[in-house]
A protein has these predicted regions:
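Short, well-formed alpha-helical segments that are part of the catalytic scaffolds
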Residues: 23-37
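Glycine-rich, basic loop-to-helix element that forms the pyrophosphate-binding segment
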Residues: 76-92
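Short aromatic/hydrophobic "clamp" motif used to bind/position activated sugar donors
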Residues: 97
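Conserved donor NDP-sugar-binding/catalytic core segment of glycosyltransferases
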Residues: 109-143
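Short, flexible, basic/aromatic active-site loop/helix in glycosyltransferases
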Residues: 129-130, 146-167
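Acidic donor-binding loop at a coil-to-helix junction in glycosyltransferase catalytic cores
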Residues: 169, 193-208
């Protein structure tokens, strides 16, 4: 394995992969945050994966590659975030592969925090950290204060093992040991975002598989990124679509063990909890009340629809 090897020698430790599709302006902000890292450039690199963009993504990435000696560009023409992420780790030269979204900004010590952790835990298979939402436009008052923040309880420790999916970090701030990532075949190309389409679950599916195989997943509270809340994600309509797709993803990853009866129970339970949430006397904007009351029922509907589709595909479900 390149990077940190068994005898403790150091080469290129981390390859930071940035997958991007038609977001050249946001990519510029992300890459600038990486260019400003306070870490020896001989220990890490940046691999920008252009996933078939038609805007100025190639130009932006190319300018950073010319300016920064440890930046380079790869291309994945088959659309899909999982495919781009897989291209990224295959192109990487480091012993560890870190992923950050193209609409996220790394804190100045982001790379140094992960390298320090790897040095202290040379066999660690996977870890990630919190992300904090920020907006460039007016943030609607109805959005929950915790919206697009992913931060785990530090009372249990700032560095600690976690169990997916009960505790989790998001795909915009995660690190894998490359040989472990390769041994699982990378990310499932049938899961995740595809172009402008909403999709989730590729990192959850992978991390669950790693856990089942005996690998430990860690949370590092000091490994921080800021994640842009895009304007389109500040509408209730977009969030309802997101809840639905999350449910579909849940069924294809975590929820595979449930039969039809248990799924119906979960749906009714979510609906009942949603009604209780809606009539909660606590004062809040109407749209926020809808957000809280609909997120789990809509997600369970997505899971049930996906389950029925799978039965139809197997010829085990008939409507007539």
């Amino acid at each position: 394995m390149q990077g940190m090897n068994g005898d403790g020698n150091e080469g290129l430790i981390v390859s930071v992969v940035v997958c991007t599709f038609n977001r050249s302006t946001l990519l510029d902000v992300c890459l600038e945050s990486l260019a400003g890292q306070r870490t020896d450039g001989r220990l890490w690199e940046v691999v920008v994966v252009d996933n078939g963009s038609t805007d100025d993504t190639g130009g932006v990435a190319g300018r950073y590659a010319e300016r920064q000696g440890n930046f380079r560009v790869a291309v994945e023409r088959e659309i899909g975030l999982s495919r781009a992420r897989n291209r990224g780790y295959r192109e990487s030269a480091g012993g560890y592969v870190a992923y950050i979204d193209d609409d996220a900004r790394a804190r100045p010590d982001w790379v140094s925090v992960m390298i320090d952790f790897i040095r202290r835990n040379p066999g660690v298979a996977a870890f990630g950290g919190p992300d904090y939402g920020y907006a460039l436009c007016h943030r609607p008052e109805w959005l929950p204060p915790e919206y697009m923040w992913t931060e785990l309880d530090t009372a249990k420790g700032r560095e600690r093992p976690i169990r997916f999916p009960g505790e989790r970090y998001t795909g915009c701030n995660m690190v894998f040991r490359k040989d472990v990532l390769e041994s699982f075949g990378g990310f499932d190309a049938d899961l995740g975002m595809s172009g402008t389409g909403i999709g989730y679950g590729e990192e959850t599916n992978l991390l669950l598989s790693m856990q089942r195989a005996g690998h430990t997943v860690w949370y590092l509270h000091d490994l921080k990124v800021d994640h842009l809340i895009q304007e389109r994600k500040m509408s209730l309509r977009w969030n309802l679509r997101s809840f639905y797709e999350n449910g579909r993803t849940y069924d294809r990853t975590v929820g595979r063990k449930y039969g039809l009866f248990m799924r119906i129970l979960r749906l009714f339970g979510a609906a009942a909890a949603g009604m209780i949430q809606f009539v909660n006397p606590r004062a809040m904007p109407f749209k926020r009340r809808l957000y809280y009351s609909l997120r789990y029922p809509v997600s369970e509907i997505g899971a049930c629809v996906t389950y029925v589709e799978s039965l139809r595909n197997k010829g085990r479900f008939h409507t007539g």
